[in-house]
Amino acid sequence: MSTPAHRFEPPGFRIEINERELPHEALGVIIGVEITQKLNRANDFRFTVRDAPTEGRYRWIDSDLFSLGNEVRIYLGYSGESLEVVRGRVQGLLPEYTVDGLVFAVEGSDDGYELLMVESEAKVFRRKADSDIVTEVARLAGLSPRVDPTEPLYAARTKPAGTSLFRFIAGMASHNGFEVRLSGRELVFARPAREARADLALEWEREILEFHASVNTRRTVSDVIVRGWDGTAKREIVAHAATGQEWIQEQGRRPASEITRELYGDVVRVMSNRPVASAEEASRVARAELSHASDSFIRGEVEVVGNPWIRCGSCLELLGLGSRFSGKYYVEQVTHRIGPAGFTTLAEVRRNSL
């Protein structure tokens, strides 16, 4: 069994608060760091500090370093090579006073959290495509948009009252077969990386520490039919995404819709009264829904030697798992942890073919 280069290197992390690096004595009392990145959700961070009183006063829990609202940047890596993994603001302090002393956690989320995630008043966007709306929302939140273009141009799109802007654009992402995520100072609204080259290759008993997976046809379908209404022409719009028309994740594999048809015959999902403006848009929605259903086919968790280059939206090639489970997987969620046991990365992954 070969050994990954990083396994015996000490993991490193850096934390900057309000653009100033934490002093060495502050880093020395941080006993754990955890960062979670999620598709269609905000990214979160948490680090844990051990404190002790000096002359009756705690040094760190009372420090302005950890005040609510402070900007935080966390970098992870090895041997001086580190990567910025999250940038956000302190949103919570969680102290625990016990007989063993004081330990407190500092928690927060991405920049733009308040504007994007908080339920807000209704807002109307006029004469814009979905991609234009996301670009506008990103700039409102002080983020840089990284957006794939969409069609058509809508006369009006309304974000309902009581819904967050992030939930609103996540709905548009689903409609277009896109995904939305926060990546540093960027708001990403894009097609998943289908048929992409793997960003990283990871091997069982080398980088891979554990792998758990399930194959499930409970939510897969063979076909999707979308029915809408053209109010101008006064006619029904119908589109059909047939077996095998989901987006390809890996060539040479059998897609979930094909396996579903072989096992159960026609399993057709019909979506009625969808707000589609044309047959072309209805076809995109049908294919997006077929792809979404197939994405539930194989789901897994892979724990690896800590790797900050694993991100949401990455394509991982997992090796050494046998012919059935080796292959390309798409990353939906990543949790990086540094603690007494070292640096590990846990990725939730999916695959739509076997």
Label every model-predicted segment:
Residues M1-T3, L94, V103-V106, D110-G112, ...:
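Short beta-strand-centered interaction patches in the first periplasmic/extracellular domains
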Residues M1-Y113:
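Assembly/oligomerization scaffold segments
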Residues W60, E114-E136, R146-G171, H175, ...:
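Short acidic/polar beta-strand-loop edge motifs in secreted extracellular
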Residues I133-P149, T260-V267, R274:
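Intrinsically disordered, low-complexity terminal/linker regions enriched in Pro/Ser/Gly
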